[in-house]
Amino acid sequence: MTEGRNKEELEDITLLGNQNNKYDFDYRPDVLESFDNKHQGRDYFVKFNCPEFTSLCPITGQPDFATIYISYIPNIKMVESKSLKLYLFSFRNHGDFHEDCMNIIMNDLIELMDPHYIEVWGKFTPRGGISIDPYTNYGRPDSKYEKMAEHRLMNHDLYPEKIDNR
């Protein structure tokens, strides 16, 4: 049986359980926090389903809404979920295209965690009769994860869901 985490392992986690969190409406990658992966010898997926993502159209300033799916195979570090929530919330007044938002999120998480593999998929609600679903991924170069990333990219939407107005 594995022991729980000790206080030293949790000292960098400052947002979880804090009642005085500030909800910033402007892009803040510095709010992301990480903790050590205690299972580094094993490949496994961590998946976040984020159904309340909001950003702004950079041209019109109108809000865009999406469900974002973030899946990764951790290496040494993992993202703390409360900090991820606050980070995603910080896109509320950020003006960028859907594709840019997904790549920014992925790049920030790569910088934070240096995962073996990560993918970010945004499923945006329709505007003007069109929904946009950008998918981006990354696998560590010169590893099996790089090959995995290529395979998943080429096959990520073989069975698209039926769109019925989300």
Swiss-Prot record:
It catalyses: 7-aminomethyl-7-carbaguanine + 2 NADP(+) = 7-cyano-7-deazaguanine + 2 NADPH + 3 H(+). Keywords: Cytoplasm, NADP, Oxidoreductase, Queuosine biosynthesis. It comes from the Bacteria. Gene3D superfamilies: 3.30.1130.10. It is an enzyme of class 1 (oxidoreductase). GO terms for biological process: queuosine biosynthetic process; tRNA modification. GO terms for cellular component: cytoplasm. Pfam families: QueF. This is NADPH-dependent 7-cyano-7-deazaguanine reductase.
